[in-house]
Structure formats: C-alpha cells, structure tokens
Amino acid sequence: MNISKHEQRVLHELALGGSIHHERLENGKIHDVTCYTREGHVLTDCTLSVFTRLLKRRLIRSKNGAPYRASPLGIKSVRAQMNQR
C-alpha cells in the first residue's frame, strides 16, 4: 500500500502509542484533529486531509468515542523507522 510521507509520520507516531483527538460539529462531522505523541507533544503533520485518508484506508480506528489510534492493519503497514531518542 502506498502511503505518503505525512501519512507515514502520523502512522508511525500512532504505532508508538500516540493518539488523534478530534472535535465534532453539531451534525456529527469531524472538523478539527490534533495528533499527540505518547510524550504529549503535538505533531503538526496531522491535518484533516491526512486524517481522512488514514480513516478511509482503515489504518486508524476509534472505539466508543475514544481518540483515534493505529489499527492492526495500520501497525502492519507502517515501515520500520529508527526511533531518535
């Protein structure tokens, strides 16, 4: 599966334990997303368009209204990267 650079960055952070918090309008549509790393930092690569592409490909999911996290398919499709610590 072809994944863009921004999608890859977001998916990698989600696979390491990050989450995507979302805000909904009154009609139920998501209008704002913020991606947090597991350390609590905000990832600027996570835009609404990147979020919708990951959601359409079923690489992320949410359970019971909780923040979005990487799905098992998303964890399998993310390429290995060196974690810079």
Task: Kindly label every feature range from the protein language model.
Residues L55-G65:
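A short, conserved structural fragment
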Residues N2-S49:
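Short amphipathic alpha-helical interface segments
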Residues A66-S71:
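Minor-groove-contacting beta-hairpin "wing" of winged helix-turn-helix DNA-binding domains
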